[in-house]
């Protein structure tokens, strides 16, 4: 992680417990080293026990990742960087529209049987990640379920979380797999207009309006090797890994943007 990226991430990190009056002793390891280790794990897809000796012990890094996930710190950090990216792109800090979709990924042997399933359509045994993104492809929320969960069933808690976190979102786009009662449910329960973008021709590649944005986000996420397959015992940990994959992308984008402004001030 470059110095420019650290300057972007550091203000968004949760304050240390010993500084916020919650007690405890000062941390033994530098927070930048902890963040570097998490980013390395997510980007390179290594096993926890294969953490290089240049980083803090893997147990320490795992404890921090788990603590930030349970406290919501990772999601808050991600949300702050997303707001900065939207402002840098000339958008409002909070989105008004979203696109939803799902992606099934194979599960490693570390994934318990009760949290995995089989996606008959994609012929994938593992888990399914349901995501909502804004109109420029930045992640809004993610939900991980067993791969056997139907898109419509997974979309309900996803849209519920979306509405709870973003009161500004008024419309969402989805493919034909989400058609049916979900559209009515979203309108009556969430006051959200869910618009279905149908595929015009089967067995032919066509760039669908709005739909390509979420597909590009999936491509961004899978640049991080830890997300290509699900290795996490807990679905919540895989959700955290997805957030971290986007944190890496957004921090690099913001760092480049800041450096560009320094070189060419307006």
Question: What is the predicted function of each stretch?
Answer:
Residues 1-266:
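Short alpha-helical elements
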């Amino acid at each position: 992680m470059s110095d420019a990226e650290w300057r972007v991430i550091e203000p968004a990190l949760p304050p240390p417990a010993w500084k916020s009056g919650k007690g405890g002793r000062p941390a033994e390891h530098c927070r930048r080293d902890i963040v570097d280790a998490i980013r390395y794990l997510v980007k390179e897809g290594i096993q926890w026990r294969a953490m290089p000796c240049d980083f803090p012990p893997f147990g320490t890094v795992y404890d921090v990742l788990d603590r930030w996930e349970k406290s919501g710190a990772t999601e808050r950090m991600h949300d702050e960087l997303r707001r900065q990216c939207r402002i840098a792109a000339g958008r409002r800090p909070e989105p008004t529209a979203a696109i939803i979709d799902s992606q099934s990924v194979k599960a490693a042997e570390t994934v318990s049987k009760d949290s995995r399933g089989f996606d008959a359509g994609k012929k994938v045994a593992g888990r399914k990640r349901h995501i909502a993104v804004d109109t420029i492809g930045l992640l809004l929320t993610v939900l991980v379920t067993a791969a056997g969960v139907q898109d419509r069933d997974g979309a309900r808690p996803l849209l519920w979380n979306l509405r709870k976190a973003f009161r500004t979102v008024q419309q969402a786009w989805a493919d034909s797999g989400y058609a049916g009662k979900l559209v009515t449910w979203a309108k009556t329960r969430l006051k959200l207009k869910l618009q279905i973008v149908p595929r015009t021709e089967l067995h032919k590649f066509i760039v669908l309006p709005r739909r390509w944005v979420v597909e590009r986000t999936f491509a961004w996420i899978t640049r991080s090797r830890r997300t290509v397959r699900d290795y996490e015992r807990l679905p919540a940990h895989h959700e955290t890994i997805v957030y971290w994959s986007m944190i890496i992308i957004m921090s690099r984008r913001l760092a480049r943007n800041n450096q560009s402004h320094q070189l060419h001030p307006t």
